């Protein structure tokens, strides 16, 4: 009877290398997807922070021009049934030359620059004050580009 003595295997086979490479590539793809999702979430968070800063921007302008704010010259619309204030979405629609009109125009222009872009019709600002100086400011934008839930609203309440 013939006896076959196998030599012990040395090194790794090509299949083992390919399997290891496949597992590593899936891991790297998963890490890349996780990084992309984190970047989208970071962008969404940055927009929310910018919206808050921009609401303080118009509130500070109204504090400087308190008399006009109490005369309701900064109001952009009235409150509807869903709690939204009539917004301004286009700075060019504000044609007045008073300090209040200039402040609103500058505010909407800055909103578009920091959150959306000048052609964006979904980035809007809204202000509603009463004669006692109690004000609500809403900033709206579309967050779907950043993987968000669509229209976002940041609302700030303040007394002048």
Where does each model-flagged region fall?
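C-terminal juxtamembrane segment of a hydrophobic transmembrane alpha-helix
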Residues: 23-45
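N-terminal leader/signal peptides at the extreme start of proteins
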Residues: 1-12
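Flexible, low-complexity segments enriched in proline/glycine/serine and punctuated by aromatic residues
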Residues: 43-49, 53-160
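N-terminal signal-anchor/signal peptide hydrophobic helix marking the start
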Residues: 10-22
């Amino acid at each position: 009877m013939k006896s076959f003595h196998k030599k012990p295997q040395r090194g790794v086979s090509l299949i083992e290398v390919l399997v290891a490479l496949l597992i590593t590539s899936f891991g790297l793809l998963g890490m890349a997807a996780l990084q992309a999702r984190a970047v989208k979430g970071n962008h969404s968070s940055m927009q929310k922070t910018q919206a808050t800063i921009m609401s303080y921007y118009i509130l500070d302008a109204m504090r400087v021009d308190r008399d006009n704010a109490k005369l309701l010259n900064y109001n952009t619309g009235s409150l509807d049934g869903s709690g939204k204030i009539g917004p301004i979405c286009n700075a060019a629609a504000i044609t007045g030359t008073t300090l209040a009109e200039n402040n609103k125009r500058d505010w909407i222009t800055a909103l578009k620059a920091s959150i959306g872009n000048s052609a964006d019709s979904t980035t809007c600002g809204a202000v509603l004050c009463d004669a006692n100086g109690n004000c609500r400011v809403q900033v709206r934008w579309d967050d779907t580009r950043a993987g968000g839930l669509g229209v976002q609203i940041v609302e700030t309440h303040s007394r002048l």
